[in-house]
């Protein structure tokens, strides 16, 4: 009986260590410590017009410097698509959820691939931070997605909170959070 208990105890400890290690990875690449907290206010300072047959509009913001080959962008999105122009009026939205994800946007083929000496070159990756929003006045507005493309060979990462604030300026500001 004591031997079985010892085995069970060590297997439980091992699983706990694995779970703790996986939880620590949540903060890698700007996802944990730099994540905007739920409850942050997103303040839209002027009206934005969504074109017909579109579910969102790009926020005309500020460039964040020359670190990126491609400019970061933010897009305010709505739940429904209309056949006519529609306006999202200046308002205050509350962040109710934050998600970060990345996807392979394109793959750059290397010259050695043709002779089967290499699989492919670096990929172009899209890193996105989605702020899910709530407003009693405009319930159709549901998220603000800030993203950028980066070469996988250049140590890609998510936009920091400071970079998101810069990209949104002067049309949108974030109140609260870091």
Regions found by a protein language model. Give the residues of each.
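N-terminal secretory signal peptides that target proteins for export/translocation
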Residues: 1-7
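Bacterial N-terminal signal peptides
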Residues: 11-20
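N-terminal secretory signal peptides
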Residues: 23-102
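Mature extracytoplasmic/lumenal regions of exported proteins
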Residues: 89-178
């Amino acid at each position: 009986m004591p031997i079985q208990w010892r085995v069970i105890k060590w297997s439980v400890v091992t699983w706990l260590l694995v779970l703790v290690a996986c939880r620590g990875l949540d903060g890698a690449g700007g996802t944990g410590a730099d994540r905007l907290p739920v409850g942050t206010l997103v303040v839209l300072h002027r009206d934005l017009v969504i074109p017909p047959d579109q579910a969102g509009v790009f926020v005309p913001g500020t460039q964040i410097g020359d670190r990126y080959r491609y400019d970061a962008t933010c897009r305010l999105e709505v739940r429904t698509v209309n056949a006519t122009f529609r306006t999202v009026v200046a308002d205050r939205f509350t962040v109710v959820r934050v998600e970060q994800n990345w996807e392979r946007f394109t793959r750059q083929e290397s010259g050695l691939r043709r002779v089967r000496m290499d699989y492919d070159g670096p990929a172009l990756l899209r890193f996105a931070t989605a702020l899910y929003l709530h407003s009693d006045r405009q319930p159709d507005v549901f998220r603000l997605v800030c993203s950028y493309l980066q070469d996988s060979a250049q140590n890609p990462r998510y936009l920091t909170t400071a970079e998101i604030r810069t990209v949104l300026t002067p049309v949108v500001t974030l109140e609260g959070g870091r």
